[in-house]
Design a protein with these regions (language model features):
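Nucleotidyltransferase catalytic core that binds NTPs
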Residues: 2-203, 212, 216, 238, ...
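A conserved acidic, glycine/proline-rich C-terminal tail/linker
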Residues: 205-224, 230-231
């Protein structure tokens, strides 16, 4: 989708050669049904990439190629970055992410790697991974791409019908509410108001809304001098979505 394509375009604008990896990684899914139903259309993906440039190298391995028939998770020290939010609710998700990204970085000796801030916790995990494993690569953070109504672009949006997509925009509205009120309301009050508001939508099942330190990702209960972000995860009509915004 256009979120992924924005990463590709940024890389092309800054580098001589761009490699795009397309791989649905089985080790980062904690739900078998989620893996089976995750949207995938390699022919459409390749066509979208051709419209940008015919000089893109596409790395689209099979699971056996990456894992050599032995899907085993590596061990990592995330320095607590995986304790909260996605790490709390999705089990070994980040171990799966770090395992496959380590393989990717080892296979493709790139100078830069482009990741979207929509998955901000993942960005921080990979920045930590690069430091821990001493990969000679720099992660470039890329801003979240949204539809006109504010919904963060995601492959999972394809599972939503028109009505559900409209309802899903309330996640971004909740994040914006936090951004508008962070200077005038306490964090507990912001979180409660957001929880109460989203409870009005029977299609939305809130998993978490957290305001956390941008660097160590620890949830905070009082405004601090350091940068922080608001993070949200919810199921909308049975489809799990995540989003975040920088507060200050």
């Amino acid at each position: 989708h256009n979120g992924h394509l924005s990463l590709v375009k940024k890389s092309i604008s800054q580098n001589d050669l761009t490699v795009v990896s397309i791989f649905i990684n089985p080790t980062q899914f904690n739900n078998v049904d989620d893996l089976k139903t995750y949207p995938s259309d390699i022919d459409k993906d390749l066509e979208l990439l051709r419209l940008i440039s015919d000089k893109i190298i596409v790395f689209n391995p099979e699971p056996d190629e990456l894992y050599a028939g032995d899907i085993r998770l590596d061990k990592f020290n995330f320095n607590g970055l995986d304790r909260y939010m996605e790490g709390e609710f999705r089990g070994n998700h980040f171990v799966g992410v770090a395992t496959v990204v380590s393989k990717l970085f080892s296979f493709i000796k790139a100078d830069y790697a482009y990741f979207g801030e929509k998955d901000f916790q993942q960005v921080r995990i990979i920045e930590n991974l690069i430091k821990e494993k001493k990969f000679k690569i720099k992660l470039i953070r890329c801003e979240t791409i949204r539809s006109e109504d504010g919904l963060a672009l995601s492959s999972r949006n394809n599972k939503l019908n028109f009505s559900s997509k409209k309802i899903a925009t309330n996640l971004f509205k909740a994040l914006n509410f936090a951004k508008e009120k962070i200077d005038v309301l306490g964090i507990d009050e912001i979180e409660q108001k957001i929880s109460d508001n989203l409870a009005n939508f029977k299609e939305i099942e809130l998993e978490y809304f957290v305001i956390a330190d941008e660097k160590n990702l620890k949830p905070i209960k009082h405004k601090q001098a350091e940068k922080c972000r608001a993070f949200i995860a919810a199921c909308v009509s049975g489809v799990r979505l995540i989003d975040n915004v920088k507060l200050y």
